[in-house]
């Protein structure tokens, strides 16, 4: 726990970004980037999130780490005021339950004079299902600030969440996207999700888009955005050029 606390305090993390592309020809969308994180180890090695995030979660330190990430991005945006982009950050379960987190976001944005629409907070379906009350409060508060909210790993079984909570984006589960060319049932699910989202004014993002053929099929279906190795691999945030 001490090691994790020290890493957060000292900022011993490297942020990465992965491009999320608008895939509809008529779209005039701003640039979107998913923010990913690695932890510095000795000898300049980087630990992937699967190695350290479970520990951060176990020690209930995710809200502190999420604050560090928000603050880092806000400072970067403050130094690059010409940038018109949306950065997508995954919000941990404990952060959803943290009543002080939305006011922390507001304070950071106001101090640095950064537009709230620069942030899209991503909530996992499982976390939303098991914490509906907390998710509802969190999404209402950050959307009131002007931030965006995305519901991740979405499948048709999660559609009842849309009756209770307002979202700006739905991220279609990558396991469906991977099979879109092989499995008619998964294709039908994606079509259903896309129609359901658009009917309620929500835009869709397909994750794990690996090939041009999958991308072409998603365009045909009418999905709005795509993310994955077929669009672009994760790159160090410090190298981001817009």
What are these language model-derived features?
Residues 103-107, 134-137, 184-191:
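Charged helix-capping and loop-helix junction motifs
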């Amino acid at each position: 726990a001490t090691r994790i606390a020290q890493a957060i305090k000292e900022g011993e993390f490297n942020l990465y970004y992965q491009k999320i592309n608008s895939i509809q020809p008529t779209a005039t969308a701003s640039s979107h980037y998913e923010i990913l994180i690695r932890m510095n180890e000795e000898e300049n090695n980087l630990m992937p999130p699967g190695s350290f995030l479970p520990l951060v979660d176990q020690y209930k330190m995710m809200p502190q780490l999420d604050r560090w990430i928000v603050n880092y991005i806000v400072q970067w945006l403050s130094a690059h005021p010409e940038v018109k982009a949306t950065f997508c950050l995954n919000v941990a379960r404990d952060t959803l339950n943290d009543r002080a987190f939305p006011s922390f976001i507001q304070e950071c944005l106001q101090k640095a004079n950064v537009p709230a629409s620069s942030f899209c907070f991503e909530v996992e379906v499982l976390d939303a299902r098991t914490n509906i009350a907390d998710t509802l409060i969190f999404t209402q508060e950050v959307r009131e600030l002007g931030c965006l909210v995305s519901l991740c790993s979405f499948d048709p079984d999660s559609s009842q969440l849309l009756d209770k909570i307002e979202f700006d984006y739905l991220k279609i589960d990558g396991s469906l996207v991977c099979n879109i060319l092989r499995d008619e049932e998964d294709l039908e699910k994606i079509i259903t999700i896309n129609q359901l989202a658009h009917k309620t004014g929500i835009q869709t993002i397909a994750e794990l888009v690996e090939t041009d053929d999958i991308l072409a099929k998603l365009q045909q279906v009418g999905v709005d955005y795509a993310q994955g190795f077929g669009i672009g691999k994760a790159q160090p945030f410090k190298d981001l050029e817009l």
